[in-house]
Amino acid sequence: MIDSNFAGNAAYTFPHFLGPIKEQRNLALEYFKRAVDVSLELGTDIIGSPAGGMSNKVSYDSKLREEAYKELLEYLFVLAEYASKSGIKEIQIEATPLETEFPHSPGASLKLMEDLSGSSIPYKLLIDWGHALFSPLLKEEADIDIWFEKCKKHIGGIHLQQTDGLYDRHWDFTNPNGIITPEKILEATKKSGLDDIYQYLEVVTAYEEKDEIVFKNMKKTMEFLHKNLGV
């Protein structure tokens, strides 16, 4: 069963709806319309992706940042209308660990959802454990409990990874330097009422790693998670 169709690493090659020129932003709309079409062909009615990335010049200029945000909303409303007419039921936006993207914090995530509340179909958040715990950016808000509590009614999915909170690691669960424990996963999701939300394992291995090592560590990771999460 395919539950949803989510953009992968290739999506990060492009700035999408926050690109510096109009042509890029328009192409992003076509890209996501095609994602809608492909998702329906695959038999799923949920799509998701990060929204895009700004330049530093735009991100750190309050006026330009606000203009970019308003245009992002316009594109997302248009995309939702197309997706709704096509048969998609939900679009998920991933919160990322970069201030040059929307959204990047619990507050920004909540604001985005509120600003999109009138869209043709619901927008939801995709929260990534590693992004939510990225302390260099989030400081005291690098706390999964804060994210879950503030955003819980808007969360449609969760990305699960192992990390140290210093970078967006996307380690598997064999890494001894990780700070995410099964106990915390269970406790945080239960406390916030999110224990029925799908958590998708998202591991990004080094491109140089040998296939047999990747396979071995992924097998150990899945065994570890199944055993300790009771699934």
What would you call each of these model-derived segments?
Residues 43-45, 77, 103-231:
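Histidine-acidic metal/acid-base catalytic patches
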Residues 5, 9, 26, 56, ...:
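Detector for Asparagine
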Residues 6-9, 50-53, 80-85, 157-159, ...:
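Short hydrophobic/aromatic-rich motifs at helix boundaries and adjacent loops
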Residues 15-18, 59-62, 170-172, 211-212:
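Short secondary-structure transition/capping segments
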Residues 17-124:
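Active-site acidic/histidine proton-transfer and metal-coordination neighborhood
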Residues 8-13, 51-55, 95-99, 129-133, ...:
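Active-site-proximal loop/turn and secondary-structure-junction residues that shape catalytic pockets
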Residues 4-6, 48, 93, 127, ...:
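Hydrophobic residues in well-ordered beta-strands that form the structural core
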Residues 1:
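Aromatic-lined substrate-binding rim segments of carbohydrate-active enzymes
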